[in-house]
């Protein structure tokens, strides 16, 4: 069993080898899979207040919708039986697009955007779903260095200024050690949870992060 806590305003990076269970953990936090053992107490999940930014597939990158339509779809799980977006939802979508710097792209086709622009659109979509917590699965994979740093800067702003808790699965160890407050390392031989400094002093941290 692994044990960890994420509080309001925390920034947790989940790292470790491929196949160690990171994606399974994320799906359990989202309520898509039951935990293999133990329990998950996630008030944000019960309240429907989690924004999720998944890894993109090639088909998703080629999705033929406008930026505005993609962002508004973040409200889908909150609409219930309502088929149309409310004025408040449309206003919030515009606000989130402005916050992420994609407002001027709102009428553009999503599949025509660069990788960095698409990630910002998906993050605006996640904010429409999120009140308390953002969960991101490998958000910088495939991005060029400039787009990567831009995304990290945006996440830092949301975490520090808007007190949004962030849980990010990543293989970008350098970025994780720089941005996170805490590290959850999941390995085939065990796990570690603690601050960045504690992680770097641990056997797992010395193996995976000590060379950086």
Annotate each language-model stretch with its function.
Residues 134-137:
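Catalytic Walker B motif of ABC-type/P-loop ATPase nucleotide-binding domains
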Residues 30:
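Helix-to-loop junction immediately C-terminal to a conserved catalytic motif
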């Amino acid at each position: 069993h692994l044990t960890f806590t994420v509080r309001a305003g925390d920034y947790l990076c989940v790292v470790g080898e491929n196949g160690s269970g990171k994606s399974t953990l994320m799906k359990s936090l989202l309520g898509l899979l039951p935990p293999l053992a133990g329990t998950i107490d996630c008030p944000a999940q019960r309240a429907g207040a989690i924004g999720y930014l998944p890894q993109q597939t090639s088909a998703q990158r080629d999705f033929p919708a406008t930026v505005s339509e993609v962002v508004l779809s973040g409200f889908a799980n909150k609409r219930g039986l309502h088929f149309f977006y409310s004025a408040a939802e449309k206003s919030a979508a515009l606000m989130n697009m402005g916050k992420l710097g994609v407002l001027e792209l709102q009428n553009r086709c999503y599949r025509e955007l660069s990788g960095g622009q698409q990630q910002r659109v998906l993050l605006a979509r996640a904010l429409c779903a999120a009140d308390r917590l953002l969960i991101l699965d490998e958000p910088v994979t495939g991005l060029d260095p400039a787009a990567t740093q831009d995304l990290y800067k945006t996440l830092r702003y949301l975490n520090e200024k808007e007190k949004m808790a962030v849980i990010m699965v990543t293989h970008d160890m350098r970025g994780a050690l720089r941005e996170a407050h805490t590290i959850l390392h999941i390995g085939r031989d065990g796990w570690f949870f603690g601050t960045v400094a504690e992680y770097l002093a641990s056997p797992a941290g010395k193996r995976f992060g000590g060379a950086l």
